[in-house]
Amino acid sequence: MKYKDLRDFIRQLEAKGELVRISQPIDTDLEMTEIADRTLRAGGPALLFENPKNHDMPVLANLFGTPERVAMGMGQESVEALREVGKLLAYLKEPEPPKGLKDLWEKLPVFKQVLNMPAKVLKKAPCQEVVLTGDDVDLSKIPVQRCWPGDAAPLVTWGLSVTKGPHKKRQNLGIYRQQVIGKNKLIMRWLSHRGGALDFREWCQTHPGEPYPVSVALGADPATILGAVTPVPDTLSEYAFAGLLRGDKTEVVKSISNDLQVPASAEIVLEGYIAQDETAPEGPYGDHTGYYNEVDDFPVFTVTHITHRKDPIYHSTYTGRPPDEPAILGVALNEVFVPILQKQFPEIVDFYLPPEGCSYRMAVVTMKKQYPGHAKRVMMGVWSFLRQFMYTKFVIVCDDDVNARDWNDVIWAITTRMDPARDTVMIENTPIDYLDFASPVSGLGSKMGMDATNKMPGETDREWGVPIVMDEGVKKRVDDIWDSLGIM
């Protein structure tokens, strides 16, 4: 199923019983978070708060609160089908020429999909039906949530920030939280390695003192939103990838005040600039770790224009101790990661990011081990191949007889196949999540690899244990008489 815009997605979710409208007045201050959190933890529907207190604009929450809705947003029928998205990305990351006519025929669907990659530029767009400038620019009219009691201020959470480096052909779409600090000002919290921050740094180097243009889209279509959080190759724009997911070109329009292209169907667009010498203390905020993060200075985004559709819908979320919406996104995107990793490391059988590990801080890998030290090669590969795993603190590698998604299996492998001194790899002074207050230095910490595989000659001189397995014939005979035994 494909969706042309957010409203189309809302209609189809509602038809499937995957969205509930809430007409009762609900406060954007804390109440929406509590309702959305309870709903998400119960595996419930997306929520459309039609009457947020003190605002005329409805709020859409918990949109991607189940892996199934993430899959739907990516145009797939099931979570399992997301592996096909991963295979497509793996191919686009390292394309191979067809090996013959048969291979060419098999790749034809991919080539057809590629035709949907270029964005379609419109001259008029729904996102610019209403244009606000000057004193009419007022962020307080948008029902921005304050999510937790200790949060410093309301926080824009689902904004797609559009940036462009001075030497780059394509734009970057990134999702960075933005603290509201005034009628027309937000704090742009982007970490130093993220695309927007890199673009801004290059701009400062080549255009010293000049304001940096930025546009932020709120309420884009699901393919574009999810394209911004998916590990697309550096040579592929998020708009192009969204076109692949949607099966139709992404429609964009030039911002009114700058040359950046924004999703034409977005509900709201904030346009403005970042002054190179203006920063402000951001936070504290409750984050996906389950803790409040420390206060730090980040650039200030000054909004000069707000454009929006008639009767716009504000798309919002919250972050907190897993499960939260980012954790659910992680569960779904996990299926996209697997084929990408397998293309580079065919020995990998499965890859799992436990949601309770804050989506990316721990990874469990199962593999077909072939030689001594093989598990360590896979560890290093996970840390280095995709930048999404730059901040993964713990990598556990097991054999393919272990279910990576079953902690009973994983803990059994760790406690029976590991010697802590021999099978633990420690690496110090590596990039680490800025939000990780457990690291000794902000942004710099250690990583641990755990080799929970069966050991080969060269790794041990001892006789290795053989797993206990019941005789298949006995199991079948007991299966045949089990019901008659009346045990349970």
Swiss-Prot record:
Single GO cellular component term: cytosol
Protein's cellular compartments: Cell membrane
Record's bilayer topology term: Peripheral membrane protein
Protein's UniProt keywords contain Coiled coil: no
Keyword Cell membrane attributed: yes
Active site, UniProt feature: D287 (proton donor)
Pathway involvement of the protein, from the record: Cofactor biosynthesis; ubiquinone biosynthesis
Primary location class: membrane
Entry's Gene Ontology molecular function annotations: 3-octaprenyl-4-hydroxybenzoate carboxy-lyase activity; metal ion binding
EC number, UniProt record: 4.1.1.98
Residues bound to Mn(2+): N172, E238
Biological processes annotated in GO: ubiquinone biosynthetic process
Catalytic activity from the UniProt record: a 4-hydroxy-3-(all-trans-polyprenyl)benzoate + H(+) = a 2-(all-trans-polyprenyl)phenol + CO2
Enzyme class: lyase
Cofactor: prenylated FMN; Mn(2+)
Binding site for prenylated FMN: I175, Y176, R177, R189, W190, L191, R194, G195
Domain of life: Bacteria
Summary of the function given for this chain in its UniProt record: Catalyzes the decarboxylation of 3-octaprenyl-4-hydroxy benzoate to 2-octaprenylphenol, an intermediate step in ubiquinone biosynthesis.
Protein family per UniProt: Belongs to the UbiD family.
Protein name: 3-octaprenyl-4-hydroxybenzoate carboxy-lyase
Organism of derivation: Alteromonas mediterranea (strain DSM 17117 / CIP 110805 / LMG 28347 / Deep ecotype)
Gene this chain is encoded by: ubiD1
